[in-house]
Each structure stands twice: as structure tokens, then as C-alpha cells.
């Protein structure tokens, strides 16, 4: 499978079979107030309409993070830094421990949310809530 890795801020070139949506690629993590990948994910998913695989990679740290991305339309979620931290601390065992913990958190969050399978992670299971005052949105 070919994967194109580039900045996605708006719907753009859709010739490759997969796109990785990451805030690292467009300063979402470095510039305070920049749009986050999770906020733009539904727009990108709507635009490509199932024509390509969307891989989400942006600050995934918990099972809830995974569910949010899947509910908003990502086909898969990539986890990098936490696994690297585990690897640095205890090699392969550390990386595996991080992944096991993340998967346990995912299944617990799914259970508490009434979601039985990953296939049930759909947009009707999530909503955007805007809190008055600071103008920031929470997903």
C-alpha cells in the first residue's frame, strides 16, 4: 500500500490511496490556537467519501482519543510517542505494556460509552460542545 504523507489543512489532492492526518504536519501542535486535526477530520472524511483510507495521528494518548477519531471518520489511529516512551524505558516490554494499556483503556471507554465494536464508532456517538467564554471547543 502506498501512503502519502503531507500537510492536510483543507481538502486537497486525493490521488493516493491513504492520507495521514497529523497536527505535526501543519504546526497544530506548535502554534497555539491553530486548528487541530480532530476538528478538521470530519471535513476531510466527508470530502473523500470513502475513496481513500484516513489514518489519524495527532496526540493520541487514551482510549477516548481513539474513539473520538474513529467516530469522526478515521479508518485507523496511529500511536507514536507513547510507544516510543515505553520503548525507551523498557525496550520491547515497555512498548508492549503501553499498547496493552492503551487497548485496555479503549475497550473500557467503549464499554462505558455503550459501544460494543469498533464498527459502532460512528458520528452519532459523538458531538461537539462549545463552552461560552473562551471561544474554544471541546470534543
What does each model-identified segment do?
Residues 39-57, 61-139:
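Alpha/beta catalytic cores of nucleotide-metabolism and tRNA/nucleoside-modifying enzymes
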Amino acid at each position: 500500500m502506498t501512503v502519502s504523507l503531507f500537510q492536510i489543512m483543507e481538502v486537497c489532492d486525493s490521488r493516493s490511496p491513504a492520507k495521514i492526518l497529523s497536527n505535526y504536519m501543519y504546526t497544530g501542535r506548535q502554534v497555539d490556537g491553530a486548528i487541530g486535526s480532530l476538528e478538521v477530520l470530519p471535513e476531510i472524511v466527508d470530502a473523500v467519501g470513502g475513496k481513500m483510507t484516513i489514518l489519524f495521528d495527532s496526540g493520541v494518548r487514551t482510549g477516548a482519543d481513539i474513539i473520538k477519531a474513529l467516530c469522526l471518520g478515521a479508518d485507523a489511529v496511529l500511536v507514536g510517542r507513547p510507544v516510543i516512551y515505553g520503548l525507551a524505558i523498557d525496550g520491547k516490554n515497555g512498548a508492549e505494556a503501553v499498547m496493552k494499556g492503551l487497548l485496555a483503556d479503549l475497550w473500557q471507554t467503549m464499554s462505558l460509552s455503550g459501544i460494543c465494536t469498533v464498527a459502532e464508532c460512528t458520528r452519532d456517538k459523538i458531538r461537539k460542545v462549545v463552552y461560552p467564554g473562551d471561544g474554544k471547543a471541546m470534543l
